[in-house]
């Protein structure tokens, strides 16, 4: 079965992101296909590489990166939602601030539009929102 996961919750103020990560890992471990994880609205904050949880908390940004690296899961972030929340990549930042070549988008995530999400909707058997 093909799954797409939609994450709309921020990394730490709700349970959405943690539940989405655990569900995504379970999908893979149960031999289903996880086509992509799409971060939208406050979910875009999951891609901020500068998030620094307490030492006794799970680092969700690193967990998402682990999932991407180990299973090649696509971590798609809505570009509009990300920019609205201050999550930017180097390319977007360079366009706006010519002299600053820094971004806070974690390298395992990539910015994309809702068109990409709609393409995954067409080929997924299930879309799960967190």
Curated annotation (Swiss-Prot):
One of its GO terms (biological process) is tRNA wobble position uridine thiolation. One of its GO terms (cellular component) is sulfurtransferase complex. NCBIfam families: PRK00207.1, sulf_tusD_dsrE. This is Sulfurtransferase TusD. Belongs to the DsrE/TusD family. Its EC number is 2.8.1.-. PANTHER family: PROTEIN YCHN (PTHR34874), SULFURTRANSFERASE TUSD (PTHR34874:SF3). One of its GO terms (molecular function) is sulfurtransferase activity. Pfam families: DsrE. It comes from Buchnera aphidicola subsp. Baizongia pistaciae (strain Bp). Heterohexamer, formed by a dimer of trimers. The hexameric TusBCD complex contains 2 copies each of TusB, TusC and TusD. The TusBCD complex interacts with TusE. Its main location: cytoplasm. The active site is at residue 78. Keywords: Cytoplasm, Transferase, tRNA processing. Part of a sulfur-relay system required for 2-thiolation of 5-methylaminomethyl-2-thiouridine (mnm(5)s(2)U) at tRNA wobble positions. Accepts sulfur from TusA and transfers it in turn to TusE. It is found in: Cytoplasm.
């Amino acid at each position: 079965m093909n799954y797409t996961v939609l994450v709309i919750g921020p990394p730490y103020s709700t349970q959405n992101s943690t539940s989405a990560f655990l569900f995504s890992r379970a999908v893979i471990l149960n031999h289903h296909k996880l086509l992509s994880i799409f971060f939208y609205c406050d979910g875009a904050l999951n891609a901020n590489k500068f998030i620094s949880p307490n030492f006794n908390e799970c680092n969700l940004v690193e967990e998402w990166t682990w999932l991407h690296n180990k299973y090649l899961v696509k971590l798609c972030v809505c570009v509009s939602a990300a920019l609205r929340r201050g999550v930017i990549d180097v390319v977007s930042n360079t366009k706006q601030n010519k002299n600053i070549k820094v971004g806070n988008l974690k390298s395992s995530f990539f910015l994309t539009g809702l068109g990409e999400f709609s393409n995954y909707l067409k080929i997924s058997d299930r879309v799960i929102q967190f």
